[in-house]
Curated annotation (Swiss-Prot):
Keywords: Amino-acid biosynthesis, Aromatic amino acid biosynthesis, Decarboxylase, Lyase, Tryptophan biosynthesis. Pathway: Amino-acid biosynthesis; L-tryptophan biosynthesis; L-tryptophan from chorismate: step 4/5. It holds the Pfam family IGPS. CDD domains: IGPS. It is an enzyme of class 4 (lyase). One of its GO terms (molecular function) is phosphoribosylanthranilate isomerase activity. One of its GO terms (biological process) is L-tryptophan biosynthetic process. It catalyses: 1-(2-carboxyphenylamino)-1-deoxy-D-ribulose 5-phosphate + H(+) = (1S,2R)-1-C-(indol-3-yl)glycerol 3-phosphate + CO2 + H2O. InterPro entries: Aldolase_TIM (IPR013785), Indole-3-glycerol_P_synth (IPR045186), Indole-3-glycerol_P_synth_dom (IPR013798), Indole-3-GlycerolPSynthase_CS (IPR001468), RibuloseP-bd_barrel (IPR011060). Belongs to the TrpC family. This is Indole-3-glycerol phosphate synthase.
């Protein structure tokens, strides 16, 4: 595991410990279970694809560790509304504070501004974060295989499903894919960015595709920057995309979404 990822995970452990002191897991769970407003995340992607369109998970993030601030003029609600207007299937909202300048409030504001299902994009290592995701309104959570043991993956997925959420499981190589395929979720995210070198190549998705059985929905993540990238993926029957940076750098993220998948 590289230094930046190890540092992020160490910070996450501290954050969870602090959050638990401020609010018990039992109290948070009651709030999460009381919410009856889950929006179907995986279904929204399938609905778009069944219409012959790309299933785009449009991301809302102000910054990243590798690129710094991506968007100075940052209004999560405005961005969410623009994405919804221009054909996004779902939203992905960064909730990490220290490394991505995200927040729980960004997710709440984005979700309130539209009717799209929302992924909590964060580095999840503890059940408390799954419960917190539903309590803040998330409809789906991200589990990154590189950061979790197989037993953790299973337990966190089960908790998310029990709370009514979908799960996007993220992989970077064949070994991680094996672990992901042992889970129940149909959503397999292939991150084209190597978490160790931070280099990006779409070949990562193309290389792993033959190993993925029918019944799973591949979501290609990172490095989707231009219409040709989308066309290449769709030619290989990859119909779902998680895109952030290309949209965040545009004047109007939703307009850029429409241009990318036109």
């Amino acid at each position: 595991m590289n230094d930046i990822l190890a540092k992020i995970l160490a910070v996450k452990a501290e954050e969870v410990a602090t959050a638990r002191q401020m609010r018990s897991e039992a109290e948070l769970l009651r709030e999460a279970q009381a919410r009856q407003d889950v929006r179907g995340f995986a279904q929204a992607i399938e609905d778009k694809i069944s219409q012959g369109k790309a299933g785009v998970i449009a991301e809302i993030k102000k910054a990243s560790p590798s690129k710094g601030v991506l968007r100075e003029n940052f209004d999560p609600a405005e961005i969410a509304a623009s994405y919804a207007m221009h054909g996004a299937a779902c939203l992905s909202v960064l909730t990490d504070v220290q490394f991505f300048q995200g927040s729980h409030d960004n997710l709440r504001r984005a979700r309130a501004a539209c009717s799209l299902p929302v992924l909590r994009k964060d580095f999840i290592i503890d059940p408390y974060q799954i419960i917190s995701a539903r309590a803040m309104g998330a409809d789906c959570v991200l589990l990154i295989v590189a950061t979790l043991a197989p037993a953790q993956l299973r337990d966190l997925e089960t908790l998310a499903i029990d709370l009514g959420m979908d799960v996007l499981v993220e992989v970077h190589d064949a070994k991680e894919l094996d672990a992901a395929l042992a889970l129940r979720t149909p959503l397999i995210g292939i991150n084209n960015r190597n978490l160790r070198t931070f280099e990006t190549t779409l070949q990562t998705t193309l290389d792993l595709l033959p190993m993925i059985p029918a019944g799973k929905r591949v979501v290609t993540e990172s490095g989707i920057l231009k219409p040709e990238d989308v066309r290449l993926m769709r030619e290989h029957d990859v119909q779902a995309f998680l895109v952030g940076e290309a949209f965040m750098r545009a004047n109007d993220p939703g307009v850029e979404l429409a241009r990318l998948v036109a």
